[in-house]
Each structure stands twice: as structure tokens, then as C-alpha cells.
Amino acid sequence: MVFFSCNNCGEACKKNQVERHLFQCRNTTFSCIDCQLVYTRETYKDHVKCITENQKYGGKNYVEKENKGEAKQNAWVDQVNRAIEFVTDSQVKELLKSVAGFANIPRKEAKFINFLTNSCRLRDKNLALRAWQAIAAEADKMREEAIRKQEETQKMEKAQKEAAAAAKKETTVATTAAEVTDAPESTFKWKKVIKRKLKENGGEMKIKKLKKAIIEELSAAGAASDDVDSIFDEKLQKCAAVTVDGKKVSLVV
């Protein structure tokens, strides 16, 4: 419960006593006893909750933990405020505006109607019931919105997981394919094949013909490569068992 002090006479008032006190001190303002902020007759209703002693004396880094009951009450106040915003019945709208100024608005229908009768001096039970129905309608809407948002979040998370799994699978497949392609080339016996091809052709061949024969061997071994030309030239230069003379290559006798 929020307590105020009248800045005209100094009398302390509970929040639900401020309206009555305004008949005594008409043009006054009120200071919150806890936070010392000043409120007018129009703004005091918005001051629903004030700082606790722990917040007041706990230092600048203190963070107040919201208990479950308080969380439920705050959610209920949100429903009341939404009802005020969207209700089209002017009587209900004005009634809910006056209700919104109270700290602990009952969350059960029977208690809510009794609260309107006792605290708001409302004698029209039909109006009280319409006010309850307006809040209940917003509660249903908020519940549906929460379910829809949760479903959208779950769909998004599922899509992200599936995309990540697909990307991982694609990377794995590409890596495996690269390993399969690269493995035969890394184990391909270049020097032995070069010497064998030369022996099969009388110890001498044109470089172009030898390269073609080597590429056929590579393809048969499943080791096709985009840079086979440069690899062939490098392997040929390093092969001590052959000599290169212009466009021909011969075995060293």
C-alpha cells in the first residue's frame, strides 16, 4: 500500500483516502512517504507501487526480486490497463480508470465485484459485471497472444536448428568428398607410373603424350584434379630417372 502526505496540512493518507482528503484540501499536492516524490490530484493514481526498504537502503546495485504473487498482480494490472485502452463502453472505461489507481485489485470475479461495491462505492452491479467481463476479455486476448508468440518462437528455433543441421551436413559431405577425391592423388605413385609409361613406349615419349597417359591413370584411380598440369610438370622435373629434351622425355639409361 502506498502512503501519501498532504503538502498543505501534513496529514498522512492511504492511497484510497486521498480522494476524500481532497474535499478538505482542494488545491494541494501529495508527497509519497517512501520515495518523497510529489504528485498532483491527477498523477497520484498512477503511483501504484513504491520502493521497499531494501531498495531504499540496499545501495545502488541492489535489485529487488519480484515474487510470484507480485508478478501475478502486475500481469493483472496490465490486463486492467488493456481493458481501459480497448473497451468501448464509456461507463466501464471510467470505472476501470478509477480502479487502476488501487494497488491490490482482486483477481477473482466475486471479490472484484465486492471490491467495486465497497472501495469504489459502486451500486450498479450490472456495470461491475461489465467491467469484469472487459478485463476477462483482455485476459483471454493476452493469453492467446502469449501462446502465439511462444509458437512463433518455437518455430523460429526449430528452423534455425534445422538450418544449422543442414549446413553441418553439407559441410561434412563436402569434406568427405574432398577427402575421397584427394586421397587417391596423395597416394598416386607419380614416378613409378612415369617410368612405366616410358618403358611401355620404348623409353621415350613426347611430353604431351606422356601427360595424357598419366591423366588417364589418375582418372582411373579416381584422383582427377584441376591443377593436374602443374602437378605433372613438378613431378616430371623431380623425377631423377628421366631427362627432358625439348618436347620429349626419355628414361635415363
Swiss-Prot record:
GO CC annotation terms, alphabetical:
nucleolus
In terms of Gene3D superfamilies, this protein maps to:
1.10.10.2100, 3.30.1490.490
Could you tell me what this protein is called? Uncharacterized protein C16C10.8
Where is it localised? Answer: Nucleus
At which positions is Zn(2+) 1 bound? C6, C9, H21, C25
Q: Where does Zn(2+) 2 bind?
A: C32, C35, H47, C50
Give the coiled coil ranges: 136-171
Q: Where is the signal peptide?
A: none
What organism does the record attribute this protein to?
A: Caenorhabditis elegans
Question: Main localisation, per the record?
Answer: nucleus
Listed A to Z, the keywords are:
Coiled coil, Metal-binding, Nucleus, Repeat, Zinc, Zinc-finger
What is a GO molecular function of this protein?
A: zinc ion binding
* Record-linked InterPro entries: LYAR, Znf_C2H2_LYAR, Znf_C2H2_sf
- Tell me which residue ranges form C2HC LYAR-type zinc fingers: 1-26, 27-51
Q: Tell me the Gene Ontology biological-process terms attached to this UniProt entry.
A: negative regulation of transcription by RNA polymerase II; rRNA processing
Q: What is the lineage of its organism?
A: Eukaryota, Metazoa, Ecdysozoa, Nematoda, Chromadorea
A Pfam family of this chain = zf-LYAR
Superkingdom field = Eukaryota
